[in-house]
Amino acid sequence: MDAFTPETIWNEYEELLEMTRRHSFSSRIRKYRDLSILRLLGEVSLVVACDSNASNGEKPNDTHRNTYDETAVSALKVPTMEVLATGATPIVIADNLCVEMEPSGRKIISAMQEELDRCGLLDSI
């Protein structure tokens, strides 16, 4: 790893700004299926993973009938494990639930928080 100097940090910052203006991050992004790794500064990267869990839950028309606890763990585990597999530390979970907040969304979020706590990740997110 190269040593950071004010000049190298400034140069990389300028490069990121220019890429933002051009909407061209391709030289700094590596993609693996639904996992994206954006190199920020030096060897510091932002790792983003996503997954979908559609039609999974307790609603009458859900094709995969599961409790909200099972749905929460299912939605949480794949992207979290993908981020952990890169050696990164999860810092943000976006749940993107497509259900009403009460009672379904609240139950799923609560179950996700319990699972993160059980795994020792709740305090870092």
Give residue ranges: language-model regions.
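Compositionally biased, intrinsically disordered low-complexity regions enriched
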Residues: M1-D2, D69
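Basic, amphipathic N-terminal segments that precede the first structured/catalytic domain
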Residues: D2-W10
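Glycine-rich phosphate/pyrophosphate-binding loop regions near the starts of catalytic domains
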Residues: L16-I108, Q113-I125
